[in-house]
Curated annotation (Swiss-Prot):
InterPro entries, alphabetized: Phage/GTA_portal, Portal_HK97
Pfam families: Phage_portal
Gene3D superfamilies per the UniProt record, alphabetical: 1.20.1270.210, 3.30.1120.70, 3.40.140.120
Family: Belongs to the phage portal family. HK97 subfamily.
The protein's name: Portal protein
Tagged with keyword Transport: no
Recorded superkingdom: Viruses
Organism: Enterobacteria phage HK97 (Bacteriophage HK97)
Oligomer status and interactors: Homododecamer; forms a ring-like structure through which genomic DNA is translocated into the capsid. Asymmetry of the portal protein is induced upon binding of the large terminase and DNA. Interacts with the terminase large subunit; this interaction allows the packaging of viral DNA. Interacts with the capsid protein.
GO cellular component terms listed in the entry, alphabetical order: viral capsid
Keywords, in A-Z order: Capsid protein, Viral capsid assembly, Viral genome ejection through host cell envelope, Viral genome packaging, Viral long flexible tail ejection system, Viral penetration into host cytoplasm, Viral release from host cell, Virion, Virus entry into host cell
Length: 424
């Protein structure tokens, strides 16, 4: 049987030369013995007749919206590398830097930077961890990042070293910290993050069961289960089989008829509770808020607008609340993880990655105009800095900070002194 070929080279092909080489370059094969337990990674189980797994949970609209909202918005924010000199002056690193080019444009041969960050953040939202295989050049610079399946990774502490064991079909490979870029959610030990979807399994299972119940209800022609009463008449085995065959449609089969004629004292009655009795709509509405809480997403961003004003009266305030309470932890984890795993040790303290949040913080035109005016008049931003945020070309002389000439110290108020030349 031909051995499978993989697009992601983990340096663990089964050929003897690859096996021998892997001992010297890393990623060596290991035997699939018992690995460490780092808590639940994914969601699996049953609730009644409903099967619960990762794919089924992602089909819940609330979960899909929460995961896609966080991952897509985080990936849309510009992520650049900055350099800080000895005087604490910062400037953006140009694309001659391999890491800056990788984070801004192409982290690997088949993904854009946005697609890579989107996939990594999605796994971080879903599993609480995201992993990428790091490829470096001879100088130690990162030149490629390939995302890995979080559910296939086992992280354990061996002595004082962290070992990443990755499983691919029947293959196992061990990697060192230098070879893996690790995004972690919050967790007990700091070794790995906790999986939101694993801890939300019960709540998600209720949502799955309610969807399955409604699906079966409407597939049955919106008819509740029926019981057929024969009165005091006792049927033989043959008669019972015949009655079941004749009346299986009335018990919820796909055949729809306008009139049924019941003879010999037969009668039907519904059993179980109706969707109205079970308050299905109220229960499903509660599950929307319940699942949104696991991801920290405001309910109004997943379609529950009943209490949207609690997050602010305007779109700017709601965006600010979403940024502060939901996106900021993910943004900080990205920046800190890049600093920890991807910045060379010789550049720590000099280089750092940072997101540009201006696009997300934009409000309406009137609010933006007032903000820009205040920043310009106070000298906190130059004209070209403000034009750059709107993708407008620079103006000659627009790189000089300015402020109102009549501003004077409060100690000079009521005097005829000229405004002091403070260099503004």
């Amino acid at each position: 049987m031909e051995e499978p070929k993989y697009t992601i080279d983990l340096r663990t092909n089964n050929g003897w030369w690859a096996r021998l080489k892997s001992w010297f370059v890393g990623g060596r094969l290991v035997t699939p013995n018992q690995g460490s337990q780092t808590g639940p990674v994914s969601a699996h189980g049953y609730l009644g007749d409903s099967s619960i797994n990762d794919e089924r949970i992602l089909q819940i609209s609330t979960v899909w919206r929460c995961v896609s909202l966080i991952s897509t918005l985080t990936a849309c924010l510009p992520l650049d590398v900055f350099e800080t000199d000895q005087n604490d002056n910062r400037k953006k690193v140009d694309l001659s830097n391999p890491l800056a080019r990788l984070l801004r444009y192409s982290p690997n041969q088949y993904m854009t930077a946005q697609e890579f960050r989107e996939a990594m953040t999605m796994q971080l939202c879903f599993y609480g961890n995201a992993y990428a295989l790091v490829d470096r050049n001879s100088a130690g610079d990162v030149i490629s990042l390939l995302p890995l399946q979080s559910a296939n990774m086992d992280v354990k502490l061996v002595g004082k070293k962290v070992v990443y064991r990755y499983q691919r079909d029947s293959e196992y490979a061990d990697f060192s910290q230098k070879e893996i870029f690790h995004l972690k959610g919050f967790g007990f030990t700091g070794l790995v993050g906790l999986s939101p979807i694993a801890f939300a399994c019960k709540s998600a299972g209720v949502a799955v069961a309610m969807e399955d119940q409604q699906r079966d209800f409407f597939a049955n022609g919106a008819k509740s289960p029926q019981i057929l009463s024969t009165g005091e008449k006792v049927l033989t085995e043959q008669q019972r089989s015949q009655v079941e065959e004749n009346f299986k449609e009335i018990a919820g089969g796909p055949v729809k008829k306008r009139l049924w004629i019941l003879e010999a004292g037969f009668s039907t009655s519904a059993i179980g509770v109706t969707p109205q009795d079970a308050e299905m709509m109220a229960s499903r509405k509660f599950q929307v808020s319940e699942l949104a809480r696991f991801f920290g997403v405001p309910p109004h961003l997943v379609g529950d607008v009943e209490k949207s004003t609690s997050w602010g009266s305007g779109i700017e305030q709601q965006n600010l609340g979403f940024l502060q309470y939901t996106l900021q932890p993910y943004i900080s984890r990205w920046e800190n993880s890049i600093q920890r795993w991807l910045i060379p040790s010789k550049d720590v303290g000099r280089l750092h990655a940072e997101h540009n949040l201006d696009g997300l913080l934009r409000g309406d035109s009137a609010s933006r105009a007032a903000f820009m005016k205040a920043m310009g008049e106070s000298g906190l931003r130059t004209i070209n800095e403000m034009r750059r945020t709107d993708n407008m070309p620079p103006l000659p002389g627009g790189d000089v900070a300015m402020r109102q000439a009549q501003y004077v110290p409060i100690t000079d108020l009521g005097t005829n002194k000229e405004p002091r030349n403070n260099g503004a």
